[in-house]
């Protein structure tokens, strides 16, 4: 049986924390930032955790 392949799009978008949770980045902070307020850009910088219901699916895709 061949090796399992990691889903590269998922592994690029999510980072695994030491406790096993997944961090994600918020969309909307790549371009057109001049229209956004400082507060909005600051809030987009925060990296929330992925919801519990989807963590298992993403971990399987990352082969963790």
From Swiss-Prot:
PROSITE patterns the record matches: RIBOSOMAL_L35
Family membership: Belongs to the bacterial ribosomal protein bL35 family.
Swiss-Prot/TrEMBL GO biological process terms: translation
Organism: Chlamydia pneumoniae
Renumbered residue ranges of the record's region Disordered: 1-55
HAMAP family named in the record: Ribosomal_bL35
Listed GO CC annotations: cytosolic large ribosomal subunit
Name of the protein: Large ribosomal subunit protein bL35
Stored Pfam families: Ribosomal_L35p (PF01632)
Basic residues: bias regions: 23-35
UniProt xrefs under NCBIfam families: rpmI_bact
Highest rank taxon of the organism: Bacteria
Molecular function GO terms recorded: structural constituent of ribosome
Keywords tagged on the record: Ribonucleoprotein, Ribosomal protein
């Amino acid at each position: 049986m061949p090796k399992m392949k990691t889903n590269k799009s998922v592994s690029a978008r999510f980072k695994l924390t030491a406790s096993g949770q997944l961090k994600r980045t918020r969309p909307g902070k790549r371009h057109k930032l001049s229209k956004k307020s400082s507060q909005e850009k600051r809030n987009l910088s925060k990296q929330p955790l992925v919801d519990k219901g989807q963590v298992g699916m993403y971990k399987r895709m990352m082969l963790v």
